[in-house]
Design a protein with these regions (language model features):
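Non-catalytic, well-ordered alpha-helical scaffold segments
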Residues: 12, 49, 53, 81-85, ...
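Basic, alpha-helical nucleic-acid-binding regions used in initiation and control of genome expression
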Residues: 99, 105-113, 117-203
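Hydrophobic/aromatic-rich, well-ordered segments within soluble, folded domains that form packed cores
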Residues: 73-103, 109
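A glycine-rich, hydrophobic loop/mini-helix early in the fold
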Residues: 41-79, 84
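N-terminal leader/targeting peptides and immediately adjacent processing regions
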Residues: 1-46, 197-203, 210
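Generic structural signal for hydrophobic core residues of well-folded globular domains
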Residues: 21, 39-43, 55-62, 90-95, ...
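Non-Sec secretion/translocation targeting segments of pathogen effectors
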Residues: 211-241
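Short coil/turn segments at secondary-structure boundaries
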Residues: 30-33, 66-73, 101-105
Length: 241
């Protein structure tokens, strides 16, 4: 037994749980899911609810086009909408430092070894399954919008976002902004002719607009002969679910 029933789940305890799962289970995601589920059954239902809100708050705080760009490069086969959701769950499972560093600089993912297809969809289901077993009700009956917002606001206080993280980038631009990640995961063919690889749905107006802004920021950076500016804290709030 690793946990005892006690109230007071917070961000530090959440990350301790995630870190311990990584220590115990390594890269075995199925074993990690089983282990985390076992630990949650030793907790109070109130703490299980808090964990649920924290998992989804961290997932939503990572919904950034720049990280999505990096995920597609790291996965080497591109990254769909659902794939990016599962990638963010996988990123959470790598622990606090890897998660926060990836948002501060997605290029830091060059130092993270991919495994399990960089996908951990089941992490999002564990708390709801445990809560349902404990309370005989759906967790969303008790997870209020106010709780979710409070959880999200707590989460983003610790996050420093990379200045280019809002922008979806095609490979030529990604090679400028995330050079180490591209060096690790792009094929020689892709590195030689990155303009031939298309990863974004440019039929969407919002994607085209954000790509244009990102390209303009890169052009300005190159004209000034400077490296990517230091990451700055973002005050923009994401989606709370």
């Amino acid at each position: 037994m690793e946990a005892t029933k006690q109230n007071g789940m917070n961000k530090d305890q959440f990350w301790n749980l995630i870190g311990r799962a990584k220590e115990v289970c390594g890269t075995d995601l199925e074993a990690s899911a089983v282990w985390i589920k076992q630990q949650l059954f030793y907790m109070t239902s109130e703490d299980v609810l808090k964990i649920h809100n924290l998992v989804y708050s961290y997932r939503d705080a990572a919904y950034k086009y720049g990280l999505w760009t990096a995920a597609g490069i790291m996965m080497e086969t591109g990254c769909s909408d659902d794939g990016f959701s599962d990638f963010r769950m996988w990123l959470i499972a790598q622990g606090k430092d890897v998660y926060l560093n990836a948002l501060k600089d997605p290029d830091s993912l060059s130092g993270v070894t991919p495994y399990g297809y960089c996908s951990f969809e089941s992490l999002g289901y564990i708390s709801s399954q445990v809560y349902s077993a404990m309370k005989r009700k759906n967790i969303y009956q008790d997870s209020t919008a106010k709780m979710q917002m409070e959880s999200y606001e707590q989460v983003i206080r610790d996050i420093v976002y990379h200045p280019m993280i809002e922008y979806p980038l095609e490979l030529p631009e990604a090679m400028v902004v995330y050079p180490k990640l591209c060096e690790c995961h792009l094929s020689e063919q892709a590195r030689q002719a990155p303009q031939k690889v298309k990863t974004w749905n440019v039929s969407r107006t919002d994607i085209r607009r954000m790509m244009a802004r990102g390209n303009a920021a890169i052009k300005k950076m190159q004209e000034q002969g400077a490296k990517a500016p230091e990451a700055a804290r973002s005050v923009r709030k994401g989606t709370v679910r």
